[in-house]
Amino acid sequence: MKNSRIVRTAAVAAVLFATIGANAQSEAGSKSIPLHVEASLGACTPSNKVLPLDVNVDLNYTFAKRFSLHATTTTSYFMPKNGATHDYNGATNLGGGLGYVFLPAKNDKLGDFELRAFVTTSVGSSDFKNTSYNVGVHWFGHTEKHRLVPTVGVGYTLRDFSAKGMKNINGAYLSLGLRF
């Protein structure tokens, strides 16, 4: 029940921030504000007979030409090998991270490549409480001309369950989403 309420709240927040971001760009100045919202779905390679699936909302602020600060919430579902799902198979994490655009777009059609590092930790009560560490490369198009652009992320994630006495989950991840 709590996870569905958090997911609904995150979805409403994403829609609200999307409208703010869409209206914040001025035609005359053609400058975009350095605040963006990303919503994405992700999956990690199976580890210890568990497949993690994620729903992620990321609010990011570009504070310098190539550097960005991220505040993120992730709702994860841990699918066991037998495919059984229960309410206790999920966890909601809150955290943050930093990004560095190492390959800025020279051409509007290419987009930017950003190296990101995140740390999140579980909130609320869950059997899958964890601390998550993510490092990856994310691609996104330019938002100066388009209000909604695709994002793709590839990287490595480690989920530390040491507080619960469970085995850690680690592996490659892929995320697909939209940037507002």
Located regions from the model:
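Transmembrane beta-strands of outer-membrane beta-barrel proteins
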Residues: H36-G42, H70-T74, E114-T120, T151-T157, ...
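Gram-negative (and chloroplast) outer-membrane scaffold detector with strong preference
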Residues: D58-L148
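Cleavable N-terminal export/targeting peptides
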Residues: M1-S32
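Solvent-exposed loop/turn segments connecting transmembrane beta-strands
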Residues: L41-L53, N82-Y88, T121-Y133, D160-I169
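Outer-membrane beta-barrel "beta-signal"
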Residues: H36, G95-F102, N168-F180
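A charged, solvent-exposed segment within the mature domains of Sec-exported extracytoplasmic proteins
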Residues: D127-R179
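Short glycine/proline- and aromatic-enriched beta-strand/turn motifs that initiate or cap beta-hairpins
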Residues: A22-Y77, S175
